[in-house]
């Protein structure tokens, strides 16, 4: 399947994407991952992106799209892909549309994960992340706590609350999402690609998405 996953921070895009990749071998693609991988590989595009990232600047859309094109042409994308958290803005959505037309790929659906704000706040304020950059296992102090001493089961490093997952920071991230990304819902509705899913259970959501794509 070839889909875009939309949803506010904490809507569960990553968890749902994982369930879907296990279903049909589609690969999960996020801009953060492809930028980091391009930098690590030392490609010309990666070197260019590294400059922006080291200065703490946003990587321009044109450069992101060039790196995205390289990624989508890789063999593992032939089975399908799940774009997790991209596009984020209307200009990015328009650029993605042009890119897909250029490389002859059609999206099956754009999935909007509609999760209430109070659920998102609860999920993210209770989330803890392993502080080891090579591990970064995700925990939740309610549903999947780390060890009793607050360390990671996998590597033993402290599991900490990220600075952008305090209540104040989350509210700011949600406000940014509503301003910049929510307009994509109307964009993809007009493209006749939008499927809105309201369930909170990741397996149930994955099942609904699979049914929608098969129609």
Give the positions of each predicted feature.
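Glycine-rich phosphate-binding loop of ATP-dependent small-molecule kinases
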Residues: 1-215
């Amino acid at each position: 399947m070839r889909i875009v996953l939309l949803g506010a921070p904490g809507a569960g895009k990553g968890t749902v994407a994982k369930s879907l990749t296990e279903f049909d071998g589609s690969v999960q693609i996020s801009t953060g991952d492809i930028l980091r991988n391009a930098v690590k590989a030392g490609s010309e595009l990666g070197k260019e992106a590294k400059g922006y990232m080291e200065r703490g600047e946003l990587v321009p859309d044109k450069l992101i799209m060039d790196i995205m094109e390289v990624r989508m042409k890789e063999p593992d994308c032939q089975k399908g892909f799940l774009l997790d958290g991209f596009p984020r803005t209307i200009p990015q959505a328009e650029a993605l549309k042009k890119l897909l037309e250029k490389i002859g790929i059609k999206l099956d659906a754009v999935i909007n994960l509609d999760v209430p704000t109070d659920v998102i706040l609860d999920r993210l304020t209770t989330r803890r992340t392993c502080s080891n950059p090579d591990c970064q296992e995700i925990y939740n102090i309610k549903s999947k706590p780390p060890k009793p001493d607050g360390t990671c089961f996998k590597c033993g490093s402290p599991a900490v609350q990220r600075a952008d997952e305090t209540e104040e920071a989350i509210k700011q991230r949600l406000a940014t999402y509503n301003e910049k990304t929510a307009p994509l819902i109307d964009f993809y509705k007009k493209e006749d690609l939008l499927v809105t899913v309201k369930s909170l259970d990741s397996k149930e959501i994955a099942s609904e998405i699979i049914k929608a794509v098969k129609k």
